[in-house]
């Protein structure tokens, strides 16, 4: 939530289930300082990219049943990250609200668009069919690219934002995945940024 005395937009969210134990600290007005430890190396890499390119200060410490499969840890972390984002936004006064970004990564081009609307919605298009079955190896737990959709959907619904993510073209599953995360990061950076010309909530209804 927004601290009325300091103006900082921060949140700390903890979530513990039988499958995972997750703590997320988020500062929307940070400088891209990140500390990510989920036990799934490629997911750590993606969240590091997200925090860095959004210029958020982001700490994620997660443990889970990765000896079975990393899915629970990854999806549950996205849930908590979305909750932290929603809380940190507070009343949403003064934000730009909308953001979008095109991100190229070698042969891949991805696009993300965000509306901090308070109406959760998610659209995910363009990934090649083989992404459903592809696995990116890791030293402790692999990352299955089929979960990309679940990550962004969980983030959107728990942050209560509208998020559209599309792969315009691409071939390498690593590049496709990373370009999507970076596009989401840059779109979020725009959308949550404070606009000096906006003093209230950026909605004709007066609330988001």
Curated annotation (Swiss-Prot):
This is Imidazoleglycerol-phosphate dehydratase. PANTHER family: IMIDAZOLEGLYCEROL-PHOSPHATE DEHYDRATASE, IMIDAZOLEGLYCEROL-PHOSPHATE DEHYDRATASE HIS7. InterPro entries: IGPD_sf (IPR038494), ImidazoleglycerolP_deHydtase (IPR000807), ImidazoleglycerP_deHydtase_CS (IPR020565), Ribosomal_Su5_D2-typ_SF (IPR020568). The gene is hisB. It is an enzyme of class 4 (lyase). Belongs to the imidazoleglycerol-phosphate dehydratase family. It catalyses: D-erythro-1-(imidazol-4-yl)glycerol 3-phosphate = 3-(imidazol-4-yl)-2-oxopropyl phosphate + H2O. It comes from Mycobacterium sp. (strain KMS). HAMAP family: HisB. GO terms for molecular function: imidazoleglycerol-phosphate dehydratase activity. It comes from the Bacteria.
């Amino acid at each position: 939530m927004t601290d009325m005395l300091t103006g900082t937009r921060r949140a700390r969210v903890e979530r513990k289930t039988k499958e995972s134990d997750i703590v997320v600290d988020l500062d929307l007005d940070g400088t891209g300082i990140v500390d990510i430890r989920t036990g799934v190396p490629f997911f750590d890499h993606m969240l590091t990219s997200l925090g860095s390119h959004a210029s958020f200060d982001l700490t994620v410490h997660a443990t889970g049943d990765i000896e079975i499969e990393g899915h629970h840890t990854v999806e549950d972390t996205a849930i908590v990250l979305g909750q932290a984002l929603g809380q940190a936004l507070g009343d949403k006064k003064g934000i730009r609200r909308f953001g979008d970004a095109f991100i190229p990564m070698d042969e891949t081009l991805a696009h993300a668009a965000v509306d901090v609307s308070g109406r959760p919605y998610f659209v995910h298009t363009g990934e090649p069919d083989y992404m459903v079955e592809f696995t990116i190896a890791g030293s402790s737990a692999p990352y299955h690219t089929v979960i990309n959709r679940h990550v962004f959907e969980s983030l959107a619904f728990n942050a209560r934002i509208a998020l559209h993510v599309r792969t315009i073209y691409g071939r390498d599953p690593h590049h496709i995945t990373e370009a999507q995360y970076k596009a989401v990061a840059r779109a979020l950076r725009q959308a949550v940024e404070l606009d000096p010309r906006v003093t209230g909530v950026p909605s004709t209804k007066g609330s988001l």
